[in-house]
Amino acid sequence: MKVYSSIKKRCEHCRIIKRKGKRFVICKVNPSHKQRQG
């Protein structure tokens, strides 16, 4: 999980979701694409 001030989708399988006021990128195909904002 990488933390960025600006998150973006890295492939077509990535999904941006909000949990507890934080934005996350989750990707089942490439778990290395996981990101968190803030």
Swiss-Prot record:
InterPro entries: Ribosomal_bL36 (IPR000473), Ribosomal_bL36_sp (IPR035977), Ribosomal_LSU_bL36 (IPR052010). One of its GO terms (biological process) is translation. One of its GO terms (cellular component) is ribonucleoprotein complex. It comes from the Bacteria. The keyword Ribosomal protein applies. Coiled coil: none annotated. GO terms for molecular function: structural constituent of ribosome. PROSITE patterns: RIBOSOMAL_L36. Keywords: Ribonucleoprotein, Ribosomal protein. Pfam families: Ribosomal_L36. Belongs to the bacterial ribosomal protein bL36 family. This is Large ribosomal subunit protein bL36. It comes from Chlorobium phaeovibrioides (strain DSM 265 / 1930). The gene is rpmJ.
